[in-house]
């Protein structure tokens, strides 16, 4: 079997997605020099060189905001706190006003469950090795100005269920269009 040149393989991969020859050269150069974090754009696709891999993401036509599903429960002896990161369990009496959902912003801080001090959301995502695409798609659920849940990741410690909690809110996300 004949060896395939890496540049030919890259061309077969990216050309059908709309990346041009100059971009192919830059992508290959980025791979050869082990440059992470580089982003390349075609008309309908974005390519990210992240650590040792190439990640492709189709550009969204519209940014669909997911719905927050809220279930309220009274805390009793039969209640078991869910351990899935897809469900946040928070103290309902600590919530101020309506819950809102939005994308995270630079400078956002929260207190990750189990920690005592505030942490920037950007630092949390870097520590967890989020890709640029994952960071761009990250949602937060807020009570007023406070982040109560970094969606599908971690709740805020200030809203945790304690021995004094009477009512809990179980939060989950209903996502459409593969977001």
What residue spans do the PLM features occupy?
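AMP-forming adenylation/ATP pyrophosphatase catalytic core
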Residues: 1-179
